[in-house]
Regions:
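Catalytic beta/alpha-barrel core
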Residues: 6, 142, 158-169, 178-191, ...
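Glycine-rich, proline-tolerant flexible connector loops at the mouths of alpha/beta enzymes
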Residues: 126-144, 299-310
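Catalytic alpha/beta core domains of metabolic enzymes, predominantly
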Residues: 85, 199-298
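N-terminal small/glycine-rich loop or linker at the start of catalytic domains
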Residues: 83-102, 131-136, 258-267
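Hydrophobic faces of well-ordered beta-strands that scaffold small-molecule active sites
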Residues: 95-101, 123-127, 161-163, 180-182, ...
Length: 312
């Protein structure tokens, strides 16, 4: 349920309303916009009398929210969320470029790529230290050593780093990471989502390869319910009957999510296609459709990359 307040509501009446709602076990999320203040109510709102609340002098409107996601819902939070990462703002009309190697292979490799992508306009460095691979025989990443190489590259370039967390046991190693990425395969790892919900750093959730919009937003809801409201959504292609490309990039998600949620939307055209020659046109299409940023795989020697060279 959401309660839309009139402009400049009486402070005493507002405090009384909030106290009454809290007595009934309702959790209140306040969103202050340019025109109105909105109270988002989470809990058993079936016990609340809409007409009684609507009759209050300070209330302009009361609406029930049917969607299961509340914190991530634009009805709760009409203004776009802007996630601050260092000097970079993600969302709110800003275009963020995250670029770097699929896998960190060496200190020299990630350092050289970091300098190159910064010179090309990137504002964040992506790189995988822990890699979820379809085959157990594929390169699995350098692990903690890879994280240290990313930190060195950050120190040399000033670029904040975004890297994937695969398991709860790895969380202590991520205390110096700027943005935690939850990969497509872990989009519904609810224990992991709960854990990052208690972290004081942004979380980027990649869409599962067969996930609906609602399932994706419910994953964001898990993180936000833990108190972490700095959530970013990343579309990386979904699985369809088409096999020419690695996945199928769902650009329709951008206007749909723009309607459903206030969270920033990043597009990953590299994983979506698996082919480097498709990255440019799909990146441009994503920006034209209204994406808040791009996640691009870059390698200084794609032919000899240990992971995903063809799409870099």
């Amino acid at each position: 349920m959401i309660v839309v307040l009139k402009q400049n509501p009486n402070r005493h009446q507002l405090e009384s309303l909030i106290a009454w709602l809290q007595e009934k076990g309702i959790i209140i999320h306040t969103s202050i916009g340019e025109a109105h203040t909105i109270l988002g109510l989470v809990g058993d709102t079936s016990q609340l009398d809409i007409d009684l609340i609507a009759a209050l002098d300070i209330v302009e409107d009361v609406k029930r929210v049917q969607e299961p996601y509340k914190n991530a819902n634009r009805k709760f939070h009409p203004e776009d969320t802007v996630v601050q990462v260092g000097n970079t703002q993600i969302g709110g009309g800003n275009l963020t470029l995250m670029a770097g190697p699929c896998s960190v292979e060496s200190e020299e490799q990630v350092g050289a790529i970091a300098k190159a992508v910064k010179a090309s306009g990137a504002t964040m460095l992506r790189g995988g230290a822990f890699k979820p691979r379809t085959s157990p025989y594929s390169f699995q990443g350098l692990g903690a050593t890879g994280l240290e190489y990313l930190k060195v590259a950050r120190q040399e370039t000033g670029l904040p780093i975004v890297t994937e967390l695969m398991d709860l046991s790895q969380l202590p190693l991520f205390k110096d990471v700027d943005v935690i990425q939850i990969g497509a395969r872990n989009m519904q790892n609810f224990d992991l989502l709960k854990a990052v919900g208690h972290q004081d750093k942004p979380v980027m959730i990649k869409r599962g390869m067969s996930a609906t919009y609602e399932e994706w937003l419910m994953s964001a809801e898990y993180v936000m319910a833990g108190g972490n409201e700095n959530v970013i959504l990343c579309e990386r292609g979904i699985r369809t009957f088409e096999s020419y490309t690695r996945n199928t990039l769902d650009l329709a998600c951008i206007p749909v999510l723009r309607k459903l949620t206030h969270l920033p939307i990043i597009i990953d055209p590299s994983h979506a296609t698996g082919k480097s020659w498709l990255v440019d046109p799909l990146a441009m299409g994503a920006v034209a459709t209204g994406a808040d940023g791009l996640l691009i795989e870059v390698h200084n020697d794609p032919a000899h990359a240990l992971c995903d060279g063809p799409q870099s």
